A protein has these predicted regions:
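Short, hydrophobic/aromatic-rich segments at coil-to-beta transitions
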Residues: 1-3
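Active-site acidic short loop of glycosyltransferases
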Residues: 6, 17-20, 46, 84-90, ...
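Conserved HGGG/HGGXW glycine-rich cap/lid loop of the alpha/beta-hydrolase fold
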Residues: 7-63
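Short aromatic-enriched loop/helix-cap "lid" or pocket-rim segments at secondary-structure transitions
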Residues: 37, 62-65, 128-133
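Glycine-rich, phosphate-binding/catalytic loops in enzymes
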Residues: 38-43, 67-70, 110-111, 134-136
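Active-site loop/oxyanion-hole signature of alpha/beta-hydrolase fold enzymes
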Residues: 42, 52-94
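Conserved hydrolase catalytic core segment
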Residues: 89-128
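Helix-rich cap/lid subdomain of alpha/beta-hydrolase
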Residues: 117-161
Length: 161
């Protein structure tokens, strides 16, 4: 199995086909196998050199225990590390869900490497303060409060009726 390394984290990837390089990045709790299972690889590999990547924490890639190891800039760096190992200067990108979020990171941290970038159902990182210590005023803090509030409301006796 091929791996690239970014800051001591091994990132698993696979390459299929020939043609223009196209990175496919899966969503949260999936792996690169998702692209095979959903039938994307066979029709696309005739026109593209598909670079399928297991995001850090997923599939056969390393799973660091430190929450800071999952910062958007590091995740974008993982994609760049794979491309560098393959000696690919520019690639198109498609990511969905968490993969779409990683795509926003590529647009921010490595725009010169991606002439075309497409995301589906990815959350924009605009206004997001990352990390476990995001303040209540940040988007992350407000979302956390909303989720915790929903959870508490769902556990109330009235909500269970």
């Amino acid at each position: 199995m091929p791996y690239a390394t970014n800051q001591n984290v091994r990132i698993h990837y696979q390459v299929e086909g020939e043609g223009l390089p196209l990175v496919l990045q899966h969503g949260f709790s999936n792996s690169l196998d998702t692209w095979y299972e959903r039938g994307y690889v066979d029709p696309l590999k005739h026109d593209y050199r598909l670079i399928l990547i297991d995001a850090r924490g997923h599939g056969a890639s390393d799973k660091p225990h430190d929450p800071e190891a999952y910062a958007l800039q590091l995740r974008a760096g993982d994609i760049v590390a794979v491309l560098d190992q393959l000696h690919i200067a520019h690639a198109h990108f498609f990511g969905y869900s968490m993969g779409g979020w990683i795509g926003f990171g590529l647009a921010q941290y490595a725009p010169e490497r991606f002439p075309a970038l497409r995301t589906q159902h990815g959350a924009s990182a605009a206004g997001l303060t990352e990390g476990p210590h995001a303040g209540e005023g940040s988007l992350c803090g407000r979302l956390r409060g909303a989720v915790w509030g929903f959870d508490a409301a769902a556990k109330s006796p009235r909500a269970r009726q």
